[in-house]
């Protein structure tokens, strides 16, 4: 963190990221090496530069591949108590129901979990940020987790989105992190609260025919230096293969096994399909908005090339063809 901005080797970084669950349509929560490599290669082809390991440490294989291919990481600790604070926010329960909050009986277990997360993965250069977990409200216990990460690692930043719901320990997170805040809302927040840089740890919820208006966020990274990007929710549909009555394989979601209750197809939020892990049409929007090189024309037919890569040389070679010659409009 330099002058209120997250920087990598002295340059302001913009996260063009995705949230990624560990998932295979064949083996469930244990994707194989070929599947993970396909994910990484697909990301590189489509200008994705970062992964948030939502919401737990992934197989070590992923971290090694991110080191090799050059994908930045938010390494997330295994923590989520979504239901308890959501019930509190809806008025169903008292604040005492929320965990871990300030409850001392959670402290030792959570510090151990954070320490395990750090010790296993500390030597991976792909990791730029440690995350205390996901959507677990706020409180002293999670703040102490963040302090443990800082004590163990003087060079990486610490992330936690939950302070958005509970500002009692606002310094838990080194950056302001929110979910699904409109681009205009981010700009307004930064105008009123300029103390920290801002990321969307989840945005552009990719369920169904989605990812429209993504450009409002990526354009904001150019206009507002303290907005430093975000992580799409999420990378791949979590769907499982099953045979129909004719013996043909198809991809299933909640309820297709007679399971009740179920969230239905709410696990299908990816910019890649399940199964063969192919990019969906939504990926075209992602690739365009995450592009690092853009060309703009003005009214005098002069074009400007912008290179947003942090460390790639700015010398570029061009080849152009004139398809039609016309007079300049008056």
Model-predicted regions and their roles:
Residues 1-304, 308-316, 321-329:
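Extended substrate-binding grooves/exosites of carbohydrate-active enzymes
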